[in-house]
């Protein structure tokens, strides 16, 4: 049944304004604060020079947009895997999991998402479960939208085991500009679908490896919303 608006719903003034701001302007991930602070410091130091001041303010705004951390509402249906990041689905194919995970070397479904510099670059848990492996592998910094990036570029792999025993692998891949992978997970962590677990700075890619028999729900060229778009349903 619909609820009648209360007095609190209709209030105006500073409290209402701040509530609107909080629901409209996404917060910033803590990893972005040093970059925003440095940009504002540049603007303050060059306040007598409009070009320097302007460059500092533009850089601060760009960093705030890049490191934005928008709230997301993941689906509650059991057995679904959500996109671990915002971006463009660039590949849907079968591929072997990263070798450093020491998993069986047989192809499984893989969905790749390319993140441009205009996407939110926080990464989100694709499915609830327990982290059973976290492996970082150094590599190159080629363009993340190329197929070879999955094999050649620096990457960080996280294996999540669900309550049913299925394993889903989320792989953060550095790109041409992205040179810093941040992952807050360790083996043994209990994780919840849609929660933030890391980021990659300035353009990157996310590969999601799925169990055999998984029903893929997306196609190349589709845009994904991290934490909300359903990539697949587990068998």
UniProtKB/Swiss-Prot annotation:
Residue(s) carrying Pyruvic acid (Ser): 204
InterPro entries: PS_Dcarbxylase (IPR003817), PSD-A (IPR033175)
Keyword vocabulary terms for this entry: Cell membrane, Decarboxylase, Lipid biosynthesis, Lipid metabolism, Lyase, Membrane, Phospholipid biosynthesis, Phospholipid metabolism, Pyruvate, Zymogen
Cofactors named for this entry: pyruvate
EC number: 4.1.1.65
Keyword Membrane annotated: yes
Molecular function, one GO term: phosphatidylserine decarboxylase activity
HAMAP family: PS_decarb_PSD_A (MF_00664)
Stated name of the protein: Phosphatidylserine decarboxylase proenzyme
Organism of origin: Mycobacterium sp. (strain JLS)
Gene label: psd
């Amino acid at each position: 049944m619909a609820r009648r608006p209360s007095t609190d719903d209709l209030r105006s003034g500073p409290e209402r304004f701040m509530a609107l701001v909080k629901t409209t302007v996404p917060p910033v991930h803590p990893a972005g604060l040093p970059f925003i602070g440095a940009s504002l410091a540049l603007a303050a130091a060059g306040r007598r020079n409009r070009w320097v001041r302007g460059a500092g303010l533009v850089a601060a705004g760009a960093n705030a947009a890049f490191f934005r951390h928008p709230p997301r509402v993941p689906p509650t249906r059991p057995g679904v895997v959500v996109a671990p990041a915002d971006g463009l689905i660039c590949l849907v194919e079968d591929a072997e999991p990263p070798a450093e995970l020491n998993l069986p070397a047989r192809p499984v479904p893989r969905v790749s998402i390319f993140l441009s510099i205009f996407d939110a670059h926080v990464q989100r848990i694709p499915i609830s479960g327990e982290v059973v492996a976290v492996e970082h592998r150094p590599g190159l910094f080629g363009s993340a939208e190329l197929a070879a990036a999955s094999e050649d570029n620096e990457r960080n792999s996280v294996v999540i085991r669900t309550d049913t025993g299925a394993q889903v692998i989320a792989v953060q891949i550095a790109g041409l500009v992205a040179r810093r992978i941040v992952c807050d997970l360790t083996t043994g962590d209990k994780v919840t679908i849609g929660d933030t677990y890391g980021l990659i700075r300035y353009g990157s890619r996310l590969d999601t490896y799925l169990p055999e028999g998984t029903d893929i729900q997306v196609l190349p060229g589709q845009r994904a919303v991290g934490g909300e778009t359903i990539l697949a349903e587990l068998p």
